[in-house]
Amino acid sequence: MAGTVDAQEHVAKPRRPNIFRVLRRTGYGKCLVCSLLLILCFFYATFCHVKHEAYSGSQPLLIYQHGPCAQGYNFVPIVFGLMLYIVYLMECWHSRTKIINMKKVRVEDALDYITALRTSPPIVWWKSVCYHYTRKTRQVTRYRNGDAVSATQVYYERMNSHQAGSMFIYDTCGFRDISKSILEVEKFHVTRIRLSRSFVFANMQAATEFEQQRSRFFNDNETKDDYMEVREGMDLSDVGFVEEILAFNKPTPPWFLHPIVFWFFSIFVLSWPLRIYTEWRTAVLSFQVIKLFGTNYLSPNSVNYTGPLTRTSTMDTVELEALLRREQHFVVPSYSEVMLMQNTIANSNTNYPNIRCLDPVILPRPFVSTTNEHIVLRNYGATETDNSLSEPITATPRPLRVSRSMTFAAQGNLEESAENLSCLENGSRANRAIPSSRRNLPLRSLSIGGISAWSNGYREIGNPDDSQLLIEPDEPPPPYEVALRMCAPLYERLRRSISSRLASISHSSSKDLKSLTLKSSSSNNNNNNSNNNNNDDPEHP
């Protein structure tokens, strides 16, 4: 059903308007007003001739009648009607000229022309004209009181100094025609096809490339002179563009478009009804030739492929967060977000028993690594025997410390922060042993991107024979909805962006520092005041 709707939306069909739409859009008001005034003048003269015999000539010249048909007044509608008739004929000629200048072809030729428009490559061009104004003088002669007086007139003339043109080079991004298909044109005797052209971008890469070329051209030419006139547009190569076409399904046009019929109706002041009938019998088709730039970035076969344009790549942060809440997308947490998620990770095992503590495996390596390429995290359905390890390293865990850059509490609170990561720790505090050579080193940061061999909280891999399966062998994997609910705490903590979290933390830390500074300054002032009082009072013990 969706495919049928999409196919219908991508098809253009001509439609014949009803009589009310014709009157509202193309009412031909000038022709209608002239026709009505001519008819009124004709009835006025007819009434005077029938009622008072104003134009018979049998009445004596010295007898004057009073009223609208008196002598003198009876010629007003005739003169006014003749003037209106001339204006009416000029308006009819102007309307007929528009039809004559319109391109009239067969339906087959019109479809071939539209196909040529769709297959022709686009040309998006820019033109600039740099100019300045030059101050000039000239001698003019003026007359005052009949005497000729010469004067010097100062005027400014525009001088074009530089002209340049360029066009959009789309070899890298590529293009494709996405115009609609035309159907059912042969069903109507006359079809008025209105053509237009435009271009769109498939992704931000193509739009950025277009804007860079356009800005570069204008920036290079705007320094040529004082002023710059800009022109830009779109053409189609090797095809002349026509805005309107009349297409006939027969070799000869219909009778209401014949010039003899048109002038016959116009002479008898019936041009307006003929025009309304012509518009009512003519189907209208609005067709737009659309060129899409950036197809190479969407084609997997192209070297410039960057993936399809998604909705999230064009939305701002508010819409992206709303989409996350609605569709529950998951984002890999950053270092700062991990440091802020300590309590959530510690409590995730109690709130959701299906989520197990991640037990990485430390592989034997001679040096301390800064990446997690050798850290194997157990996932759903994995076993401790799935790792092809040679011999585990006996490494003594050391207590996990919070990053110095993310620590805003006192030094005594570091042990409480380390105890909050209980899900990552399996040994007791008594069993922690740190090499003596590393005890006095500064605090190290906990990073997901890199966990060294001295990282704390990861128990050693024991004998592979006593490993336990995380799930039963015959237990199927959980469905997608269950997996979403399992990761709900992580998702809830990632609603806010990292920038907002860091801003709130820095704001709170700055407030604490300000309060501490104010307290220390106040205490210093009090001490200074007390010292001054003691110095002023020598008898004070």
UniProtKB/Swiss-Prot annotation:
GO annotations of cellular component type: membrane
Membrane topology: Multi-pass membrane protein
One Pfam family here: TMEM151
Region (Disordered): 503-541
Keywords: Membrane, Transmembrane, Transmembrane helix
Keyword check for RNA-binding: no
TM regions (residue ranges): 27-47, 73-93, 254-274
Biased composition (Low complexity): 515-535
Compartment annotation: Membrane
Family listed: Belongs to the TMEM151 family.
PANTHER family referenced in this protein's UniProt entry, alphabetically: TRANSMEMBRANE PROTEIN 151 HOMOLOG
Protein name: Transmembrane protein 151 homolog
Natural source organism: Caenorhabditis elegans
